C-alpha cells in the first residue's frame, strides 16, 4: 500500500532540494529520517518534516508499521515564483526571483494492494 505526504510552497529553490531527495529514495523510512537528521541543510529539514508526516499518515490512517515502510518516491516539484526587484546601479532595478517548491514523499510497505 502506498501512502504520501505533500508540502506545498516551501520557500526554497527546487534545485537545492533535489540533491537531498535523490539520496533518500529507495531507503527504509526510518533510515532516511536518521540520515536527514545528520545533514546540516535547510532542505534536509524541510524534507525530513514531510517524511515524518508521511510516516504518521501511514501509522494513523492506514495502520501500517513504520519499520516496514520504504521511500518509493521523493519528488521535488517546481512551485510558483515570487518576482521582486532590488535597486541596481544608476537608479535601475534588478529582478530577483524567489523560488518555491512542492515536496511529495510516497512511502510503500511492499504489498501491492
Curated annotation (Swiss-Prot):
It holds the Pfam family Ribosomal_L22. Keywords: Ribonucleoprotein, Ribosomal protein, RNA-binding, rRNA-binding. InterPro entries: Ribosomal_uL22, Ribosomal_uL22_bac/chlpt-type, Ribosomal_uL22_bac/org-type, Ribosomal_uL22_sf. GO terms for molecular function: rRNA binding; structural constituent of ribosome. GO terms for biological process: translation. GO terms for cellular component: cytosolic large ribosomal subunit. Belongs to the universal ribosomal protein uL22 family. PANTHER family: CHLOROPLAST 50S RIBOSOMAL PROTEIN L22-RELATED (PTHR13501), LARGE RIBOSOMAL SUBUNIT PROTEIN UL22M (PTHR13501:SF8). Part of the 50S ribosomal subunit. This protein binds specifically to 23S rRNA; its binding is stimulated by other ribosomal proteins, e.g. L4, L17, and L20. It is important during the early stages of 50S assembly. It makes multiple contacts with different domains of the 23S rRNA in the assembled 50S subunit and ribosome. This is Large ribosomal subunit protein uL22. The gene is rplV.
Amino acid at each position: 500500500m502506498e501512502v504520501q505526504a505533500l508540502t506545498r510552497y516551501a520557500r526554497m529553490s527546487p534545485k537545492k532540494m533535489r540533491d537531498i531527495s535523490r539520496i533518500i529514495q529507495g531507503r527504509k523510512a526510518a533510515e532516511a529520517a536518521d540520515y536527514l537528521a545528520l545533514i546540516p541543510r535547510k532542505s534536509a529539514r524541510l524534507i525530513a518534516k514531510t517524511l515524518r508526516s508521511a510516516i504518521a499518515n501511514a501509522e494513523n490512517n492506514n495502520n501500517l508499521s513504520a519499520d516496514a515502510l520504504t521511500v518509493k518516491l521523493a519528488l521535488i516539484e517546481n512551485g510558483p515564483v515570487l518576482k521582486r526587484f532590488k535597486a541596481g546601479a544608476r537608479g535601475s532595478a534588478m529582478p530577483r526571483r524567489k523560488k518555491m517548491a512542492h515536496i511529495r514523499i510516497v512511502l510503500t510497505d511492499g504489498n501491492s494492494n
